């Protein structure tokens, strides 16, 4: 110890090496041996000593940082990443104390990991580009996987707030070409847009999407009773809204093409959903994962977006967005005019006819329990 403190690394290493076998109840001074070897420039001997020490003290911060630095010098980037990540994890544990001398080593580790992630990301993206799968749905999913691998994105899964049906694919968005019936609805977009515009011009029929009820606690939603997010109900609680439906015959006819659930007191459900400029629907989860939500854009100004899970898409006139609202999702209008979509729900396509019938019976039984639908859409 005295020789090491005096800067005589050679003497220190020689004397400490005599103690490698240790003694009963006294462990070998592997960390000191490693420090002496490192000062001598003998990285190989330092690594051996640190490996012995970390076997007994796997979360010793100083030893982890020393080993990481040795791996960097030795060109073993992946090993260095592992030791630096373990060290940073140990440093952030509750109650962890960090000696001042280790702080620069921790900062060096953070910088190394950031640079390493950048290099690794570029390598993976180049590999994906070389496969020719960089575009389209397959490419998007590969890039999402890379983002998860590199920690650039959080993992989102179905988290319905009321009812979870197991075994369904964890997909945030579905693609238009998966639904043959959708073309018939999209063909009616010009007529539906005219009907929605007429409803807006009449200033009647729209009401806040999230409403308070006198016999329930107020919803914990910042847009509660706020007309900036409004709904023009065409179907509500399984029944057509007569006055509104009569004003929108083309829309009502178009909805007949969709596989909308028919559940007493609950579905069909269909609305014009209006979002005014500057309005942001905060992240939230839907109640069920047995349905998909369809947005048929009727008025789709620039500056609007929908994030479902880790993926963000924009509305384009006439191009339906289909998504699983049991994933965390949010929407915003940063444009200069209102965004209006035709919103309705459909069965998940994976559900068999038998499962759909059973779920219909189950949801109706749930709603009969107190005579009130838990989810009206």
Regions found by a protein language model. Give the residues of each.
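Canonical positions in the second alpha-helix
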Residues: 18-19, 52-53, 86-87
